[in-house]
């Protein structure tokens, strides 16, 4: 069922031709800014992984991966949901040292995504991962990295405004940090998404920390798989979307689990069966580097900076009939 929302009086900010130019500009400029900010090396990434490897992201635990068999190699493969675990293994295989990292273009299919203005079954991200020292597994280090990423985003937005003077999106470089428990304490009677909207109305750039574990209410703010982020050292970068008047996630990131936090989180999540998978065995045995990483939505960033009201304006995907009809009637072209 369609959940599309068209703001009253909305008109596409650019022609289709100029839109493509702007998308190209954002992706090229931000990739350079991100690489400079985080000292990353670009690498090639897989579109699919072997099911038995345990490398795919289980997301919230109920999403079904797109799967297919490969007769010639006698294996079942899955199109990736994300590269969170693959990147960590790649850092070991490619022999990256502390302070060095990688980034890559990640393309995923999330078939069970509930599509709306912000969500598509097609996910495109800049994925990054960095080797860190054990003493860097702390909140201060996490916050410094968040500020670096937000700075790169704002630099690209400033450059876009010069290249395309008709675009006027303003982004706030000043990051407000708050934990999910602090946010629940502020708005105990609201849903997690309503809480995000409330805090983003006050602070237009927020890093919402500690996502995955249960809060005092007995529920987590949002789902996170237990085997990549440390739930005490992760979060989402949220920015205010002036077109849709809502909180707008541009990045999910965090310091990754070590052997101790993985052991604890697998038990809390009821996922002890994963301990026998190759990736998880290596991690529990301390054979993988300590890392932090995340993903930054490419279409999300384009949508925000350009001022589009629907993610289908900046990426090509498949939509339900009600959504395509509503957008057509409003003069919105879905790619």
Regions picked out by a protein language model, each given a short descriptive name:
Residues 34-41, 149-160, 309:
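A generic secondary-structure signal for well-formed alpha-helical elements
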